[in-house]
Amino acid sequence: MNELQLLGPRAYGDALGSAVLKATAEDFQVDEVLDIPLSGEGEHLWLWVEKRGLNTEEAARRIAKAAGVSLRTVSYAGLKDRQALTRQWFSVQLPGKADPDLGAAENHTLKILEATRHKRKLQRGAHAANGFTLRLTELKADQAAIDERLKRIAAQGIPNYFGAQRFGHDGGNLVDARSWAARQALPEQRNVRSRLLSTARSYLFNQALAARVADGTWQQAQVGDLLAFTDSRSFFMAGPDECTDPRLAILDLHPTGPLWGEGESPAGGAVHELEQQMADREAALCEWLIKAGMSHERRILRLPIGGLTWHYPEPDILQLEFVLPAGCFATALVRELVDLVPVGQTDSSCAF
């Protein structure tokens, strides 16, 4: 499956040219933003880790081995990509134990930048946001056109698609999810089950968002929409008054789409009809998610780009800096600008 099938149409028109992303790890930098004051005491050792050429799970295994503890005692807030320079927090549960020597975990691919104690472990999804610094190299596009589109994106946001990398190479994760859904069965391995259920939900969300992008309503509240604030998981239904809420215009409040689970779409009016039609087309996937015990949640359709700045270090290099809420994809922004040219034989651009 191609990117258009897995995501949907662009919001701002065709790509303005092409570029390479991640020719080196430094071209894709991610800093986890964690709004948790650390107490300096407790049985959990929190580590601020810089890694390159190493994914989060591999880093956790290295830390566990060096600390002499079970992998189950090592926690992290979110998964970060292997092909990047990333900085993120880990925690290690060490009840009644002194800080271990973690030197064996460190080399040119992993550095521990800070270590401190806290009373609680790091929970999945605990980070508030991710800060990105991207360098698009071998840029073949008109700078004036890029600048104009970035100004529009800063003012209006972008469709909050799950990135193509969520679906695996050529959509392989989705193919696997459909296969399991056709049998209404679940993989026994927990990590495989979690990955494929997440893939199915992401695809259904993208389908609903694609329909809203196609009809031009992805950033407009309609009566029956379920609205949510950027950093909130709660939502409320829009009536006529809510559709003119000034917080919509300043990108604080947004229409949402379905993360499918038990029951019909809780949206109303035309929005309910659109989402239910999508669910009817993908009945096997929806029934599979319900059978797996997933509850219905919502995700904002429009993604505001925090602190967006850009410049050109060289005529053929575009550097972007911005902040996104946790769980959102930097490649969704890049996609609105240019087509990415694969580096060597690499087909997947990044994990955000």
Swiss-Prot record:
One of its GO terms (molecular function) is RNA binding. This is tRNA pseudouridine synthase D. It is an enzyme of class 5 (isomerase). Residues 157-303 form the TRUD domain. GO terms for cellular component: cytosol. CDD domains: PseudoU_synth_EcTruD. Its EC number is 5.4.99.27. Keywords: Isomerase, tRNA processing. SUPFAM superfamilies: Pseudouridine synthase (SSF55120). The gene is truD. Responsible for synthesis of pseudouridine from uracil-13 in transfer RNAs. Gene3D superfamilies: TruD, catalytic domain, TruD, insertion domain. The keyword tRNA processing applies. It comes from the Bacteria. InterPro entries: PsdUridine_synth_cat_dom_sf, PsdUridine_synth_TruD, PsdUridine_synth_TruD_CS, PsdUridine_synth_TruD_insert, TruD_catalytic, TruD_insert_sf, TruD_pseudoU_synthase. GO terms for biological process: tRNA pseudouridine synthesis. It catalyses: uridine(13) in tRNA = pseudouridine(13) in tRNA. Pfam families: TruD. The keyword Isomerase applies. Disulfide bonds: none annotated. Belongs to the pseudouridine synthase TruD family. It comes from Pseudomonas fluorescens (strain ATCC BAA-477 / NRRL B-23932 / Pf-5). The active site is at D81 (nucleophile).
